[in-house]
Amino acid sequence: MDLTALAGELQTGLKLQVLTNEPLSRHTTWRLGGPADLLARPRSREELDYCLSFARRKGLPLHILGNGSNLLVLDGGVRGLVVQTREWRQVIIEGRKILATAGTLLPGLLQVASKKGLGGLEFAAGIPATVGGAVVMNAGTPAGCLGDLVVGVEVLDYDGRRHILENREITFTYRHSSLHRAGTVVTVTLELVPDEVPAIRERIEANLHRRRSRQPLEWPNAGSVFKNPPGYYAGRLIEAVGAKGWRVGGAEVAEKHANFIINRGQATAADVMELIDRVREAVARQLGIDLELEIEVWGEGL
């Protein structure tokens, strides 16, 4: 595959930024992972549509990248085209409803909403995700999930057709949604709750403080590695088997929160995967509970 020629063709007629053999360690919160064959960074609806149609025409594998959180890219990298959405950020407010492009960062959306006196999204304070990625995985905390607020989601299906899906047409479950199979999220519309600005900001600060005090945010990480099994907290299970502080290469089970694996410097995806396997095996053997990954895994090993 001539990546330079493909990149040039993808850029034709647009001021689209396209990178070849781009290390995805630069674009993920874990700061690790191999290269993308092609990385495109659309800044408008037109550019996003063009990227998706280009991948279809060329038969390229397609991955949609938001802020790179909740994601492990293997060391061999990702074949085909990776489209990074976070360069196209737009927010429109109409009454209690707020429409955001998929690449809008949740912290930015929360800031805009709070200034307008719109509450209900405070549980998402500190989640380092784009709106598109967050709605696909139904991101949230024990205080709430994004799917609870969704009015509608605009998607482009795999044939390039546009659909507006209402909440009732989408299945939201714990850290998952049917949007995984729907295509590419373009915009998300949420319905929030009017409230006093100081009260909203107080809740945001309380949630940020709680997150900072309980999570190892001083180290590169991808958020929670495992889903909580029904009736349990994954972090407590991992702690119960004595896995806090376990280390493989530069990857370590965080002392502050055992459901986080941190990159202490020069960690590889292979280090992380080996640590994940060790933790899962220990929890299954000692407690009889299978831990399911919350993170996504892309690409191929070396």
Curated annotation (Swiss-Prot):
Obligatory cofactor(s): FAD
InterPro entries tied to this protein: FAD-bd_PCMH (IPR016166), FAD-bd_PCMH-like_sf (IPR036318), FAD-bd_PCMH_sub1 (IPR016167), FAD-bd_PCMH_sub2 (IPR016169), MurB (IPR003170), MurB_C (IPR011601), MurB_C_sf (IPR036635), Oxid_FAD_bind_N (IPR006094)
Q: Where in the cell is it found?
A: Cytoplasm
Its UniProt pathway annotation is:
Cell wall biogenesis; peptidoglycan biosynthesis
Domain FAD-binding PCMH-type intervals:
32-195
Say which domain of life the source belongs to: Bacteria
Q: Which residues are responsible for catalysis?
A: 175, 224 (proton donor), 294
Task: List this protein's GO terms for biological process.
Answer: cell division; cell wall organization; peptidoglycan biosynthetic process; regulation of cell shape
Matching entries from SUPFAM superfamilies are given as: FAD-binding/transporter-associated domain-like (SSF56176), Uridine diphospho-N-Acetylenolpyruvylglucosamine reductase, MurB, C-terminal domain (SSF56194)
Q: What GO molecular function annotation could you give as one example from this UniProt entry?
A: FAD binding
Question: Where does this protein chiefly localize?
Answer: cytoplasm
Give its E.C. classification number. 1.3.1.98
Which catalysed reactions does the entry list for this protein? Answer: UDP-N-acetyl-alpha-D-muramate + NADP(+) = UDP-N-acetyl-3-O-(1-carboxyvinyl)-alpha-D-glucosamine + NADPH + H(+)
Q: Which UniProt keyword terms apply here?
A: Cell cycle, Cell division, Cell shape, Cell wall biogenesis/degradation, Cytoplasm, FAD, Flavoprotein, NADP, Oxidoreductase, Peptidoglycan synthesis
Q: Which GO terms describe its cellular component?
A: cytosol
Pfam families given in the database record: FAD_binding_4 (PF01565), MurB_C (PF02873)
This chain's function reads:
Cell wall formation.
Family as reported in the entry's similarity comment: Belongs to the MurB family.
What protein does this entry describe? UDP-N-acetylenolpyruvoylglucosamine reductase
Gene symbol?
murB
